Amino acid sequence: MTAASTLAVIGIFDFFGTIFAGWLSDRYDNRWLLFWFYGLRGLSLVYLSLSGFSFVELSVFAIFYGLDWVATVPPTVKLAAAEFGRERAGLIFGWVFAGHQLGAATAAFGAGFLKSDFNTYMPALQIAGVMCMIAALSVLLLRKPGTAKLVPQPA
């Protein structure tokens, strides 16, 4: 399977994964959805780094990674709206998107640096996979939307 074919399969499954994630985000706790989406994304990246890159292995990766590729957006938008209000959700998500781009640039630079040192992208895939799993656990630390905020009281 060529890189272009793999990316095409990812894109096709991304379409369905994102729509399904939107449907799920209207019905379930978005923190748990993000936990599963980031966790499965991390496992997909680690799987890719350990695979033999055969047609079947790349197809399995492309399907699972595609289903999850943009699936984090609907629950993230819902959490932003719940925390900051619907009128500010767009602004907040814009900042999240900007931060995402800075992270992507840093990750691309880091992957290139690792490639030049190790002559392979495998360490970069494994680090990205582990970071996704850390993100999955971190999402569970978010306060459940609709619960009261703790406000310090004067003594």
Task: Describe these PLM feature segments.
Residues 57-71:
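Hydrophobic core of transmembrane alpha-helices in multi-pass small-molecule transporters
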Residues 32-47:
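Structural signature of the two symmetry-related core transmembrane helices
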Residues 15, 39-43, 129-136:
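Small-residue-rich packing faces within the transmembrane alpha-helices of Major Facilitator Superfamily
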Residues 129-155:
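Multi-pass alpha-helical transporter architecture, strongest
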Residues 1-12, 91, 95, 123:
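Loop-to-transmembrane helix entry
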Residues 24-25, 110-119:
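Interfacial helix-cap and linker-helix signal at transmembrane-aqueous boundaries
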Residues 11-19, 101-105:
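Residue-level signature of mid-helix packing/kink "hotspots" within the transmembrane helices
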Residues 71-84:
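Intracellular juxtamembrane helix-capping segments at the cytosolic ends
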